[in-house]
Swiss-Prot record:
<dbReference type="Pfam" id="PF21473">
    <property type="entry name" value="Ssb-like_OB"/>
</dbReference>
<keyword id="KW-0007">Acetylation</keyword>
<dbReference type="InterPro" id="IPR048970">
    <property type="entry name" value="Ssb-like_OB"/>
</dbReference>
<dbReference type="InterPro" id="IPR012340">
    <property type="entry name" value="NA-bd_OB-fold"/>
</dbReference>
<dbReference type="GO" id="GO:0005886">
    <property type="term" value="C:plasma membrane"/>
</dbReference>
<feature type="modified residue" description="N-acetylalanine">
    <location>
        <position position="2"/>
    </location>
</feature>
<protein>
    <recommendedName>
        <fullName>Uncharacterized protein At4g28440</fullName>
    </recommendedName>
</protein>
<dbReference type="GO" id="GO:0003729">
    <property type="term" value="F:mRNA binding"/>
</dbReference>
Length: 153
């Protein structure tokens, strides 16, 4: 059983890792996961955390640490999308930085796409990219609606 979080195939005594397939921003679709892409951070906006008035009794014994959330506009030469950075990820997502997002997923928020990296994914800082971000193709501005297809209406 692999515990490193990477896809690996056991072949005898050695382990062969699967090569990452890099995708472009314009190829992202709702409800998909496992994306690896190289992007530039265009802007980063802090999201004010919502404080909850009531807490369960089990969580009163430990102090609450406020979570840091930043919505970043990221992109490549094909388009851009909003990325939700949480806690330690916030430090890497500075405007102008180039990062590699590994095993990222598309989350839907109010009918729009957001890119995210959970505990199974990784964000790596990399050298400056040579591409210019195409900001006029923002996939987060496209609103999706779930339509039930069937005869029971």
């Amino acid at each position: 059983m692999a515990t490193t979080g990477t896809a690996a195939v056991a072949t005898g005594t050695s382990t062969v890792k699967r090569k990452p397939v890099f995708v472009k921003v314009e190829q992202l679709k709702p409800g998909t996961t496992g994306h690896t892409l190289t992007v530039k951070v265009i802007e980063a906006n802090i999201v004010v955390p919502v404080t909850r008035k009531t807490r369960p009794a089990s969580s009163l014994s430990r102090p609450s640490q406020p979570s840091r959330i930043v919505e970043c506009l990221i992109g490549d030469e094909t388009g851009c999308i909003l990325f939700t950075a949480r806690n330690d990820q916030v430090d890497l997502m500075k405007p102008g930085a180039t990062v590699i997002l590994r095993n990222s997923r598309i989350d839907m928020f109010k009918g729009t796409m957001r890119l995210g990296v959970d505990k199974w994914g990784r964000i790596e800082a990399t050298g400056a990219a040579s591409f210019t971000v195409k900001e006029d193709n923002n996939l987060s501005l496209v609103e999706y609606e779930l339509i039930n297809v069937g005869g029971d209406q």
